[in-house]
Amino acid sequence: MRVAVGAAFFLSSADGVRIMATAVWDDDTTGRKDGFWASGHVPTLIAAFLYFDLAFMVWVLLGPLAPDIARSLALTPAEKGLMVAVPTLAGALLRLVNGLLVDRIGPKRSGTISQLIVIGGLASAWMMGVNSFGATLALGVILGFAGASFAIALPLASRWYPPEHQGKAMGLAGMGNSGTVLAALFAPTLAKLFGWNAVLGLACIPLTLVLIAYQIMAKDAPGAPPAKSLGAYFTPLKTADAWWLMGFYAVTFGGFVGLAASLPIYFTDRFGLSTITAGYCTAACVFAGSLVRPMGGALADRVGGVKALTAVFIVAAVALAGVGGASSVEAALALFVLAMLALGTGNGAVFQLVPQRFSAEIGVMTGLVGMAGGFGGFYLASSLGLAKQLTGSFSSGFLIFAALAIVALVGLMLVKGHWRRTWTAAAGVRI
């Protein structure tokens, strides 16, 4: 016999498949908790990863294509920076919308709507052409729907898993950040073979295939909270904890996605690399950050999100400050990999903390925190382009963002004691 802690419950289907809502399950005779893979719904976790992965691939698609687009449209450094930053800003704003949709119509339907919009936008851009700077910005807004997938994929996966496995579940689903690797690896080569505009149409093929798999595999978790009034969704913003978590994610995820979008431009402009070589360098950096995201969640489960973030902010600040003075592509690449390892770990660590404090508002908090991360990415990507145009160098942009990581570290030191005293963590969960 199983006993549910809280309001969650088990369902057993005719074929014996066990379905679990977001809860801690204890065996009332042994006190044992289910292992990670047995405690949730693995097909949904896989579907969330695939959906997130391909969405992130197209979200940053303008980054690897930026050198080719800039040459074709004669863009300035500031315009290049803004072009790759707009999808990040649009994604930030749309994440809040998706967070609201998730709690009202469920993550599966929300994801379907968002993916159809992205596929339609890319197909239209491919057929009609992108012939001006304004058109690139309009396309960037459409690609923002792909970035907003964050607020869908994570609740889709996390609602199936108990508190002690939240870091792993959200880390594995969030490993869809690796989609940025696919964009960096393949977009420049495809652009060389077929032209950069054709890449927009080619991207629709894997998006459609994954959407089909998503429809088959993904299931909304039972026992989802009832829809609240619109005003109730913004209740978390009345608490300082929400703003702190948003600020921390603006640094970790903002740094990750801002670099993913900007590094192709950096490597081509700073060191004169070809677009394909710059894509390989970017892919190496992004892969490092994506790989450690689930490890960051698992690390936070083990030692606590606060300790994990402390190390993250220190390493990220040192690495990004070092990039400002890097004189060779090898040194810059090594420092970017180090920075991305730290930032990827931080992404997982922040989302280990979010459900511990806001379990009842996980949908909207995912949207709010993700929105803040998008704002951070927009700032980094746009400021790097502006710094290049005004000073002739990217260095000041990296130094300012390194300083923001130090500010986040100071903030974390200020709130960690209060969090540990006042948050009520589930048994076995560290803060």
Question: What kind of feature is each model-predicted range?
Answer:
Residues 134-148, 250, 331-345:
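Hydrophobic core of transmembrane alpha-helices in multi-pass small-molecule transporters
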Residues 303-350:
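C-terminal transmembrane helical hairpin of 12-TM major facilitator-type secondary transporters
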Residues 139-176:
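Cytoplasmic helix-loop-helix junction between adjacent transmembrane helices
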Residues 116-130, 315-327:
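C-terminal ends and interior cores of transmembrane alpha-helices
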Residues 62-67, 240-294:
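Extracytoplasmic gate region of multi-pass secondary transporters
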Residues 172-218:
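Helix-loop-helix hairpin linking two adjacent transmembrane segments in secondary transporters
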Residues 108-111, 309:
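Primarily marks hydrophobic transmembrane alpha-helices of the MFS/SLC 12-helix fold
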Residues 198-215, 396-414:
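Symmetry-related core transmembrane helices of the 12-TM Major Facilitator Superfamily/SLC fold
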